[in-house]
UniProtKB/Swiss-Prot annotation:
This is Conotoxin vc5c. Expressed by the venom duct. Residues 1-14 form the signal peptide. One of its GO terms (molecular function) is toxin activity. It comes from Conus victoriae (Queen Victoria cone). It comes from the Eukaryota.
């Protein structure tokens, strides 16, 4: 049981701490995702009703 707890507590390569260089890239991806989602929502909304494209 102790061995299993030790193995579970060892950090893996997939889980790494974020550095200050990682933050702008994560922010960029979040902004890009929000922009694409907004554009796709406007296209669906505005196609039948052009007045909603403000």
């Amino acid at each position: 049981v102790i061995l299993l707890l030790l193995i579970a507590s060892i950090p893996s390569d997939a889980v790494q701490l974020k550095t200050k260089d990682d933050m702008p890239l994560a922010s960029f991806h979040g902004n890009a995702r929000r922009t694409l989602q907004m554009l796709s929502n406007k296209r669906i909304c505005c196609y039948p009703n052009e007045w909603c494209c403000d």
